């Protein structure tokens, strides 16, 4: 199981549209194979968002990443566009 984080800062002028798009994001992400989707906004940095969810395979992660980076309507709401939509996957650390 991989944990995925998506991080971006919304363009202030496009915040309303982005929030409207985010209302259906959980459903869209689950349809692509994400589990336990959450979207959070920074307390100390309003407009900074992090989405997090779990996926079962690297392939699902890569498909979701490609899909999100190609989502021009949403990326247009991000300060800096798709280049500033950061997507990272993490696996459990093997300690000891």
Summary of predicted features, one role per range:
Residues 2, 32-50, 73-96:
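Glycine-rich beta-strand-turn "strand-cap" elements at beta-sheet edges
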Residues 2-9, 38-66:
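Short, well-ordered beta-strand segments in beta-rich or mixed alpha/beta enzyme
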Residues 7, 25-26, 49, 89:
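A generic structural signal for ordered secondary structure
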Residues 11, 24, 34, 61-64, ...:
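General helical secondary-structure elements
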Residues 14-16, 58-61, 95:
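Residue-level signal for secondary-structure boundary sites
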Residues 14-37, 69, 73:
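Short amphipathic alpha-helical segments
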Residues 66-69, 79:
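A generic structural signal for secondary-structure junctions
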